[in-house]
Amino acid sequence: MKVSIYGAGRVGVSIAFSLLHTSLVDEMVLIDIDKKRAEGEALDLLHSSSMFKSCNIWAGDSKDIEDSDFIVITAGRSQRPGETRLELLGDNVRIMKEISEDIVKYSPNSIIINVTNPVDVLTYFIWQFTNLPSQRVIGTGTTLDTARLRVLLSQQCGISPASIHAYVIGEHGDSEFVPFSNATIGGLKLIDYCKLCENNSEQGFCLNLKIIEEKVRKAAYEIIERKGATNLAIGAVTARLISSMWRNEKRVWTISVLVDGIYIGYPSVIGKSGVEKVLRLNLSEDEEKKFQYSRSVIQKSIEEIKSKIF
């Protein structure tokens, strides 16, 4: 397997390091505007690869992405003092355009995974710029948020996260939400499981769903406040996404996927060739309203970029 990663910052390197642990990667290319940094990170990763399957890792240029199985995008710049959100977004869309042109020129058969935020908006523009099948252009979406949710439920319920089927959907951002009506543990609705749980209250319900949902939504802010950035968990999640596709596991992930004309976090089956099926959830009336609102947030950003930048 060959993986090319645009962006050798903390997120890009965390993804690369997590990929080494899978022992599936034969070649890995790091591409960054700061070539010297990319070379240093590549060398450090190369030395660590001796602990895993042998992997050829180097800092390259756009042409080196040729014949990549997966291209991961973590590139982008941060907000400058006094700069508006739209100005920043416009610049990052332009960066995505340059990368998209590289992909079309050198490796048009790759599966593209975008990680750069706002992930849903930027993944949409990558899809537009490359004109590749949407099945092969995805974003990490709410996969990390879903992982956070399952950890919180696991701690509360005393059940392995692997046995908890609950998802965060919508925008990877403040409008994301949890459709708890679809959440299950061992085939039981989450609410029904709570009646059997040793932690249950007199009312037969041990979870404050609003608090858990808010903790998931605020998790990134909490981490950034303490360490300045989130990188390890998204690194693990992205590497797991790649290994899942490479092994053709056909697992369900809440990736950013094309749904009714825009990219948004939604449960989808992914395999060797990318997205195989988008699973339409049976949402409650309130959940449907939340989903449509989240969708409108993404749509608004897309329309702003189209009208003011291009």
From Swiss-Prot:
Active site: H172
Annotated control of activity: Allosterically activated by fructose 1,6-bisphosphate (FBP).
PROSITE patterns listed in its UniProt record: L_LDH
GO biological process, one term: glycolytic process
Subunit structure, as described in the record: Homotetramer.
Record NCBIfam families: L-LDH-NAD (TIGR01771)
Name of the protein described by the UniProt record: L-lactate dehydrogenase
Gene of this entry: ldh
